[in-house]
């Protein structure tokens, strides 16, 4: 039963990518239902990182590039309470979308709740090296999302599934502070069937922003494999929001001259009516697995099934809000 407090507290929710922003909005709405005050900010930097951001040297990142402006526009359109940089008031709790780069103005004496966004990058020799050298000052963000959670600076870490709880514990996170809540946007795949989208019975190709974050992407090889695996099928493309569209679409047109190409539109309705997903490293592969449709991925599908986010009918945001409330 919903328990509403009479002395609500101030909670700062730090957004990031569009997915993270939508997750935070859902969590904030649940906190408001509990009687607390949810304040939002797009991701922001401090210190030397602020100077680098001002110079445009961090625009390649997903949380500080184009998606930061999209996050701000989304917050504006929702009419939620905002406090850019969390500077206007003292907060009783902070909800983080990542701990790879933590603003240095966050209050150290209040609880921090970290929320898993989705799929993490594969663990590599380099990412393990970064983690080992972190104690000597090497920043965790250099390991990308494979190092999520390893700052250890959070009070609770809300994760997608029991499989992920085990995964993060194996990576070195404190298991006693990890809570399996499910994660918003990936906890109710069946609902996608009800969303409106004009096309039906197609193969949906979900590309990733590997090149934009300086990873290897043999894009033309991937596109040829998609073509060869799906002869005669209707193909629809959904580009990652962080991708350079002109380049990506030019490559697609070489093999798929008439295929629809989307980028800014939400992927969920497209997934709900697809017959198959072709992915690179997209977290959205989880939705295809939850729906039971065929999927391909650069990642190990058996491992993805082990990590599959809880399907709890969309209760994850409320679960996370309850974790926050217990700390207030």
Show the residue positions of the predicted features:
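Active-site and donor-binding regions of nucleotide-sugar-utilizing enzymes
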Residues: 12-34, 39-188, 285
């Amino acid at each position: 039963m919903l328990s509403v407090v009479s002395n609500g507290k101030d909670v700062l929710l730090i957004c990031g990518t569009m997915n993270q922003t939508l997750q935070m909005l859902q969590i904030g709405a649940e906190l408001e239902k509990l009687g607390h005050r949810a304040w939002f900010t797009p991701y922001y930097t401090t210190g030397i990182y602020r100077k680098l951001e001002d110079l445009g040297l961090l625009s390649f990142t997903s949380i500080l590039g184009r998606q930061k402006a999209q996050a701000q526009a989304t917050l504006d359109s929702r009419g939620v309470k905002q406090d850019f940089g969390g500077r206007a008031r003292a907060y009783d709790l902070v909800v983080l979308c990542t701990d790879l780069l933590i603003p240095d103005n966050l209050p150290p004496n209040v609880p921090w709740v970290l929320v898993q966004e989705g799929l993490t990058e594969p663990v590599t020799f380099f990412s393990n090296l970064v983690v080992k050298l972190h104690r000597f000052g090497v920043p965790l963000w250099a390991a990308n999302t494979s190092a999520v959670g390893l700052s250890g600076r959070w009070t609770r870490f809300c994760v997608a599934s029991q499989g992920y709880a085990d995964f993060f514990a194996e990576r070195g996170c404190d298991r006693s502070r990890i809570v399996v809540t499910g994660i918003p946007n990936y906890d109710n795949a069946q609902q996608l069937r009800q969303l409106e989208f004009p096309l039906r019975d197609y193969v949906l190709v979900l590309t990733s922003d590997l090149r934009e974050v300086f990873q290897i992407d043999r894009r033309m090889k991937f596109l040829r494999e998609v073509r060869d695996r799906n002869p005669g099928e209707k193909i629809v493309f959904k580009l990652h929001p962080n991708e350079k569209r002109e380049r990506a679409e030019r490559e697609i047109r070489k093999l798929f001259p008439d295929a629809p190409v989307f980028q800014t539109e939400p992927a969920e309705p497209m997934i709900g009516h697809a017959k198959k997903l072709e992915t690179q490293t997209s977290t959205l592969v989880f939705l295809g697995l939850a729906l039971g449709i065929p999927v391909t991925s650069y990642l190990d599908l058996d491992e993805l099934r082990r990590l599959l986010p809880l399907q709890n009918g969309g209760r994850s945001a409320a679960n996370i809000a309850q974790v926050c409330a217990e700390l207030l």
